[in-house]
Amino acid sequence: METLETEKFFSDDKPLLKPISDHSEIKTKARRNAVVSVLIQPFQWLQMLSSRLNLSFVLGVVLVYGVNQGFSGSIFKVVTDYYWKDVQQVQPSVVQLYMGLYYIPWVMRPIWGLFTDVFPIKGYKRKPYFVVSGVLGLVSAIAIVVLGKLPAALALSCLLGVSAAMAIADVVIDACIATNSINIRSLAPDIQSLCMVCSSAGALVGYATSGVFVHQLGPQGALGVLAFSPATIVILGFFIYEKRSSTVPTQKTKKDTDGLGVAVKGMCKTVKYPEVWKPSLYMFISLALNISTHEGHFYWYTDPTAGPAFSQEFVGIIYAVGALASMFGVLIYHKKLKGYSFRNILFFAQLLYVFSGMLDLVFIKRWNLTLGIPDSLFVITEESFTKMISKIRWIPMVVLSTRLCPLGIEGTFFAFLMCIDSFGQLASKWGGGFVLHAFGVTRHDFGNLWLVILIRNILRLVTVCFVFLVPDSDHLDDLVPSDVLPKKQSEDDDDDDIKLLLL
């Protein structure tokens, strides 16, 4: 009897083990599904953007921001640093001044914006400017490689041509970005996230390969890689679809003149609104007060006596890791921060930016070695944190800029706001060059570099005092009155959506 009861007891227990096993399988399957969900989320996000904005617009952003700005821009930064240092043998403070000149074509973005908005060529407003941009960049990049060692002024002119090509292509695609951000305002943060992801991904590839290019081809030969991006922009200009204007030739001049007048009046009227000029002023202050010490850092990085003497390949790796961290910054903003007000995000991001600047000071003073942290580990950690915070700090300002653009002159006005950004960066480069020169930082003397960095960090802290200029609103709020432009619009306005011609 007892044996039968025991057998029954154990036989009754056996089914109890099965649900536990099933539960374990369910948990394993859930974890697997979660991993798959995370992996396919970016593709679902791209599909959503393509369906709501159209695939051609997304591809246009990938080409201009990913290849033109990200990849080519990162190659430009690293290779030109070595070019001025090793080929032209220029002092770091002078290179800072040259780098400021690179921003002149970007300062001229309102002019490029006016051309794309009101001066179509052969009935097209976008296609011809892509071609012009690509040809200019292609010729400039090839010239600086083929002509050998050029005088500094001529070499600077070629590099300015490459920079101008990037700026023109950027303006053309930004006009479309501003239009879509206005028409579908809920997607404005997503569009900027797409831009930043493409830019960071392209920069990651560019930085990762830049050191190898410099090592294998030399600083001057590596500049030839800059011809790749404008070549793709030329092809894009020929194969992109755009609806041709139906305006007859006899009416063209009058239409262009009227359009120019409307654009200028709209800009003047818009910029007078406090909701517009206050955040624009903050954007300039936050960039201008953040004086650049990049060339001082770069010369110190690669100096075998005073600095850690990083190799060309490792310098590229540092920047590549920074680009990867930028992508994490975009992800953090997109997932966690885009619902907060512009003012709150910028306030806390600026405070973290001050802290990241103090890490530079620790590295220059070599306190990291006292703490037992190797130079390579510390610089990669510092670069990652700085780039991530920089991106979180920058995206809200760009999103805010798109919300300040009145419909009808969005290309021109967005270019105007980005021109303010370029002025700020130019002031940052020249201000940093002046301070480096004033404190006697040269190719081989870095004794006062830590003082320059300390001054820069203090100025970053001062910037926090101006955050009140930023509106305490989010990306869904109306910032610009709807009556900025006259209501009369041309009936045959071109469709600004970029559509790739499917072959």
Swiss-Prot record:
The record's subcellular location field reads:
Membrane
Keyword terms of this UniProt record:
Membrane, Transmembrane, Transmembrane helix, Transport
Q: Is Transport included in the keywords of this UniProt record?
A: yes
CDD domains recorded for this chain?
A: MFS_FBT (cd17484)
Q: Name one GO cellular component term.
A: membrane
Q: What is this protein called?
A: Probable folate-biopterin transporter 6
Q: Which family does it belong to?
A: Belongs to the major facilitator superfamily. Folate-biopterin transporter (TC 2.A.71) family.
Transmembrane domains' residue ranges: 56-76, 101-121, 128-148, 153-173, 194-214, 221-241, 281-301, 314-334, 344-364, 369-389, 404-424, 450-470
The record's Gene3D superfamilies line, in alphabetical order, gives: MFS general substrate transporter like domains (1.20.1250.20)
